[in-house]
Amino acid sequence: MKQGIHPKYETLKVSCSCGHTFETRSTRSEDLHLDVCSECHPFYTGKQRVMDTGGRVDKFKKRFGALGKKDS
């Protein structure tokens, strides 16, 4: 590799709004703040919920249900 053309690779501190912090390496020089990380995101914590707010599935089936039916 050529010397002096690559950005400096530094250690930076990553912090989340939940309070979890960790260190990683990057060419970014300033610290990084995240809104959601693997410690607090529902997908990773197993607290994921599937919600049908306002009956959206039923509304969709009501509008487009007839399109999927086959004539015999």
UniProtKB/Swiss-Prot annotation:
One of its GO terms (molecular function) is structural constituent of ribosome. Binds 1 zinc ion per subunit. SUPFAM superfamilies: L28p-like. Its cofactor is Zn(2+). The keyword Cell inner membrane does not apply. Coiled coil: none annotated. Binds the 23S rRNA. This is Large ribosomal subunit protein bL31.
